[in-house]
Amino acid sequence: MLTLIQGKKIVNHLRSRLAFEYNGQLIKILSKNIVAVGSLRREEKMLNDVDLLIIVPEKKLLKHVLPNIRIKGLSFSVKVCGERKCVLFIEWEKKTYQLDLFTALAEEKPYAIFHFTGPVSYLIRIRAALKKKNYKLNQYGLFKNQTLVPLKITTEKELIKELGFTYRIPKKRL
């Protein structure tokens, strides 16, 4: 367990230190492409882990980011890692914490932020209401009859409004 303040410090530290190896080069992940999600974004007082969403600018890079993740100046070990999710244990101030990393393409960003911020109970209610209208919402997009529904949105707030719901800031979601 860690406090909200500790979680924010870890994220601030990581923003300038995340990179991945690609074709023999170390590519820095820009701070603007790192989004805190999960209980940290909901500003819960105590956190089980730190969840970060990494926005990947090009689809061809997607499969390279997490399996080749590097954190400058921070000791870490990989528990499990795939193309879209990686669970790490990081050493921070003489303690070990779990860091969950997720990836999304730029066009998936609002959906991924919504999905990974949660909480699960809130997502279930939104998805149940959408299911009654034959829609499916996940971290990749909005679908009707298994076909992606293109929405002209760039933020989570726009997504919620487009779906016909009232936007709630993450810490007010139940």
UniProtKB/Swiss-Prot annotation:
Q: Which GO terms describe its biological process?
A: double-strand break repair via nonhomologous end joining
Mind telling me which residues the site (Stabilizes dGTP in a syn conformation to overcome the Watson-Crick base pairing constraint) is annotated on?
115
Which cysteine pairs are covalently linked by disulfides here? Answer: 81-86
Q: Which residues bind Mg(2+)?
A: 49, 51, 100
Where is it localised?
Virion
EC id: 2.7.7.7
Q: Does the keyword Nucleotidyltransferase apply?
A: yes
Alphabetical list of PROSITE patterns matching this protein: DNA_POLYMERASE_X (PS00522)
**Documented effect of changing residue 115 to A:** Complete loss of MgdGTP binding and dG:dGTP ternary complex formation but not dG:dCTP ternary complex formation
Its Gene Ontology cellular component terms are:
virion component
Record family assignment: Belongs to the DNA polymerase type-X family.
Q: What is this protein called?
A: Repair DNA polymerase X
Identify the species of origin: African swine fever virus (strain Badajoz 1971 Vero-adapted)
